[in-house]
Amino acid sequence: MSPEPVPPPPPPQCPGCDRAEPIAQRLEEGDEAFRAGDYEMAAELFRSMLAGLAQPDRGLCLRLGDALARAGRLPEALGAFRGAARLGALRPEELEELAGGLVRAVGLRDRPLSAENPGGEPEAPGEGGPAPEPRAPRDLLGCPRCRRLLHKPVTLPCGLTVCKRCVEPGPARPQVRRVNVVLSGLLEKCFPAECRLRRLAGQARSLQRQQQPEAALLRCDQALELAPDDNSLLLLRAELYLTMKNYEQALQDASAACQNEPLLIKGHQVKAQALSGLGRSKEVLKEFLYCLALNPECNSVKKEAQKVMCEVLFSATANVHENLTSSIQSRLKAQGHSHMNAQALLEEGDAGSSENSSEKSDMLGNTNSSVLYFILGLHFEEDKKALESILPTAPSAGLKRQFPDDVEDAPDLNAPGKIPKKDLSLQRSPNSETEESQGLSLDVTDFECALCMRLLFEPVTTPCGHTFCLKCLERCLDHAPHCPLCKDKLSELLASRNFNITVLAEELIFRYLPDELSDRKRIYDEEMSELSNLTRDVPIFVCAMAFPTVPCPLHVFEPRYRLMIRRCMETGTKRFGMCLSAEHAGLSEYGCMLEIKDVRTFPDGSSVVDAIGISRFRVLSHRHRDGYNTADIEYLEDEKVEGPEYEELAALHDSVHQQSVSWFASLQDRMKEQILSHFGVMPDREPEPQSNPSGPAWSWWILAVLPLERKAQLAILGMTSLKERLLAIRRILVIITRKMNSRQELANARERNN
């Protein structure tokens, strides 16, 4: 008889809990409560489990600390982490939740800065929205990214102008853009003192990058003589002092910057570095918490803060006072704790301590007792004092002023154009108020196009930094892909056709030269009105024969015709005339008006123009304009007939149409394909032959494909009698058909002879 199988042992229970549930199940309940955001419940579950365990669990201590930190019970959370530290050294990454709780305690979590703006400087207003109205000339000349007066202004492809050091590197801007010559000269003229200040600061930063701190410090001191309260210069000098290990001076400058601009993250970072050099770890942690309160997503600062927390808050956790057990006993009795396992743990600690049975059991007893001491919150007052030493205690001491709790009083850092008032005053030079009250002294010579020698109209800046009128630049690029002034290659600009207006230059002209701009616009409007006239000075393309309703694709590569096509598009007419060249007159007497349907531009500036014939005209006179021909013209229309003449015309129309269809059908397949690919399908016969002023569309299509000399085509184009044109087409078809038949008969005869 085989023995009965032994049942498996029951899962471990949690002896101190009211319900005898497995530890794993209770742990899952706590984790679920934490994930659901019920941190108070999670903390109570983890604490009850720890109190009921015979041996404390480090992972449970960490869970308890995380839950308490999330619940805002920071002194108790600190005790839980102290308990974990007694069971094993804490790692910085284990303190993420505690760090988050401390950051929330600072009181700025509701107004974080974007992770994309780690410097703490206010973001530029969105490019897509309307810009706020500038309050002063200097604000108009400010960089939209750093909010300071433009320094080495660079105009981006989008038309926005920023400081050169504010240009964001990346694959989107493979071509290095140079300083805008026009705007740079304007800044030097209007703000000479501040431009000198920015030059000195730029030289100092350059020397800093070249690892020449002494020379950089000299330039920085010279710049600070001009603007003693400039925060960026104060922080630059603080960084130089850090490099030279002069931590006291670095702390002095960083503190001044933080006092001037409390919401500047970089100021608190530099201050933390200086304090670290002086060994003042608690203050280092405080500055890191300020940084994280301003920008919770700054991971590098978060990691450093967690490292400092290990040093500041948990360095002495292992050295708990020797009489810990008696202290635990007295506090447990005072607070009425009566867990059986807790009392057993205390007795175990006492026995181990008094009997000295072994060093190992003594250490175990003290460790278990100290863990319980911390997780039960018996170290609360000490932990509260420790936190008060690193967190701001009195709003009147400056924190409330630096980091206001009232949302209405707090500066909205994400709103376009809004930065702290202190910020604006500090970023101005000492003479800025005088300069702004006088306004900008501008004249036409400050914004003169080097090509047309007139006021810039629709200013466009090249990558090399030169600014021209849009139309002037396009005309120059028609001839060569080079800058008209410095001869730099502009092949990329020509290929992209990214001619965006330089917004700042246009706005300055609009605000300070309104009368001159009005005169310049009047001249431009007059030119456009003249160019849009479709009877006088009509642009003429001298190239090939064109017919009404027939497609006429063109490859435009000559500079004069590039200009002509561009003007046709800009005026909105999208029309130009097509004529043949004449040996003596220069232009043929008759031509066809074409309408542009599409323009496809190539990187070299040439283009393919898809056009179609619209109407016929006769040239009255012609002349030249900017290299291409123009003409005064009169449009031609067919003379309409009625009565018996109309009946005769209708019969002739049907007959010639049928004759044309038969001729096309008799062509070889290869020739048909060539004709169809170039001219398209033959239009259908129209029921009313006189419905179109230029005549039936099929008649022009057949004239375009018939093998005729240009002189004959031109003569038919100028006819205003539909009957005469149809008779001419019939005669041509008869002649061509006879020739085709003769060739066929000759070919057949040769085959018979062979």
Curated annotation (Swiss-Prot):
Extent of the TPR repeats: 23-58, 59-91, 197-230, 231-264, 266-298, 447-483
Gene Ontology terms describing biological process: motor behavior; negative regulation of neuron apoptotic process; neuromuscular process; neuron apoptotic process; neuron projection development; protein quality control for misfolded or incompletely synthesized proteins; spinal cord motor neuron differentiation
ZnF segments: RING-type: 449-487
Compositional bias per record (Low complexity), positions renumbered to this chain: 115-125
Stretches for region Disordered: 112-136, 398-439
Organism domain of life: Eukaryota
A GO molecular-function descriptor: zinc ion binding
Protein name: LON peptidase N-terminal domain and RING finger protein 2
